[in-house]
Amino acid sequence: MYSRYILLSALLVIGAETYAKNNKTEVVALSSSYNNSVENNSVDSSSQDSIFKDEILHEVKVVARKSGTSRLAGAVNGIAVNKDELFKAACCNLGESFTTNPSVDVAYNDATTGARQIKLLGLSGTYVQMLTENLPNFRGAAIPYALGYVPGPWMKGIQVSKGSASVKNGYESITGQINVDYLKPEDEQQVEVNLFGDTKSRIEANADANVHLSDKWATEILLHHENILKNHDDNGDGFYDMPGREQYNVQNRWLYKGKHYIFHGGLGALKEIRTSGQDEEHVHSDDIYRIKLHTNRYEGYMKHAFILNHEHGTNIAFMSSASMHQLDAQYGNRFYNLNEKNLYGSLIFETNFTHQHNLSVGLSVNHDYLGQRANVNVSPRPAVGQEDSPYLLSEMQRMNEKETTPGAYAQYTYTLGTKLTAMAGVRFDHSSIYGNFFTPRFHVKYSPVDAISIRLSAGKGYRTVFGLAEYNYLLASGREFQITGDGLKQEEAWNYGMSTAFYIPMFGKTLKLNAEYYYTDFKNQAVVDYDANKGLISIYNLMGKSYSHTFQIDASYPLQKGLEITAAYRLNDVKCTYDYGKTLKEKPLTSKYKALFTASYKTPLGLWQFDATVQLNGGGSNPEPYQLADGSQSWSPRFHSFEQVSAQVTRWFRHWSIYVGGENLTGFKQKTPIYGASNPWGSDFEPTLVWGPVEGRMFYAGVRVHF
């Protein structure tokens, strides 16, 4: 018996030393072969980290812990997040997956609909290209709510790249890309169930199962349901703090893998109902302000890869996707109906001439159609029970939009061992609205020694703005909604970046230190302006300057066996010209800085895990306040900094685990998330100026089962 413990101790020491040694070098990416096009051109989480196979010593299981995040190995600066990192928090959906991430912020757009967006490099998530399995996804009206459309238990990993990304996936990446890597049919066969509940009356159930039908065929099904059973108004302003929400989500995915041909395909459907507005228990009136959003979404995709030469990674791949997004929305007496359709296809050829030279060329086409009906600026209030009266219907206007954009790209990558990787790419596209446009991008990574990596990037990005669809949540405001009569131009920006990563041996372990700077310069931008007219929210083309400077430094260190800490600080300088070119000022509702500290500890046998995150979010500016009828200011010109703390404890068993935790444990809430709440039918009603949490402390518990 005594000899067993001696051997166990020796194995743990050897594992820890190996971990420190291996983490001095960066992760190794998959080669630029068919895996890039069809299976995943990001690094699989199982191959990114230093992985130690479980050693079984009679009934004692030795586990060496791997990191939950790792840096992407190529020329593009980015990180890969695997399930170990996602399990550090409840991670009910994509929007809740970045709690422990220093680079990505997630915030509510308004206090009534629950619309959320990410911010990367100090700018809104509209400038981040969203991908699922490396296919562009979630466009137009899906943007404000897309973070809730990807259940957390469905995700195998997330890859976040910063700056202009590869031209292979299109021209839309301005500040970066976020790619969601779903669970795969070809993964180890298992059934998983995840149940979740919190103190805000939210419950969730998730299930997934995959089957290997043969040595070539595999399939899986993913299921999700969530429901907020009871609305609440904790701040007493007469409005629900968060909308009621019920969602059903399902996907079926298939794989065929032969020697020279690989197929991936799948179908998905989502149904979601959101209800919000005034709390009938606290507002004693027959004239209740209500918000209702009914969404139906259907999507499908196919990926075909033909492997022509295994030795050189020569392959041809065809990838396509289609989606239909239907939205019926009511914001008080305003109605917005949408039927949005998207088709995307790309044909890719890749080959490695030698181990040093890789070429990727391809063609693509993207088509968007938005059938819209809205009564955006109706001012008369309908009588109770007359919301669907012919009078209101006569105010509905059709505003259809469509765009078709075919294009071609070429990308060359030069790799000199582990010392140098240079990637240059160009795209040429033609928009049926804006005509021809050219997209150059360049990335280089240089490692003079194994412990240092330097990355430089420069590139251009473009984006078509579907103003009403993307900003339909602004219809909740009491102001009128105005989009420039000349039409919104294509957004256009340059992005430049530099980052340096250090791997420093320290006390027998490795300190990972990263510093980066990014500059985004807009040549044209759709400006959302609250300042030009107090009675309007105006969206118009940029008249002047708009830019973002972002500096970030972060460090992580395994303080002791099983304990890893991370600290980060980010500084944002984001400015835009408002009031139709008159004033260059800070971008409203954007924090000037963010500091983050995380600690994660897993016991030696892997039975218990403790995670904690502390955030300090810096203050910033609000839109220009104005004087109300009573002589007071509509709101403060600035908002102040605030802290947030979250924590979770997980107990692991052989085939299941339980977790309990809490979010926003400091209890901080934005004091007035809804301005003018006492009169939602007036022009001073404003629920869209949210800069902080709208709910207080929340506690939760859940169970994960797999067999």
How does the language model describe each region?
Residues N315-A329, S447, R455, K489-Y547:
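Membrane-embedded beta-barrel scaffold of Gram-negative outer-membrane proteins
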Residues Y149-Q190:
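A beta-strand signature from Gram-negative outer-membrane beta-barrel systems
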Residues G95-P136:
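Extracytoplasmic beta-strand/coil segments of soluble accessory domains associated
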Residues K523, I565, L616-P625, T650-F707:
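C-terminal beta-signal and adjacent terminal beta-strands/loops
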Residues L135-K162, V250:
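Short acidic/polar hinge/loop motifs at secondary-structure boundaries
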Residues T415-T418, Y517-D521, N541-Y626, R704-H706:
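Gram-negative outer-membrane beta-barrel transporters
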Residues I228-N249, K257-I316, A322-E340:
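Flexible loop and strand-edge segments within Gram-negative outer membrane beta-barrel domains
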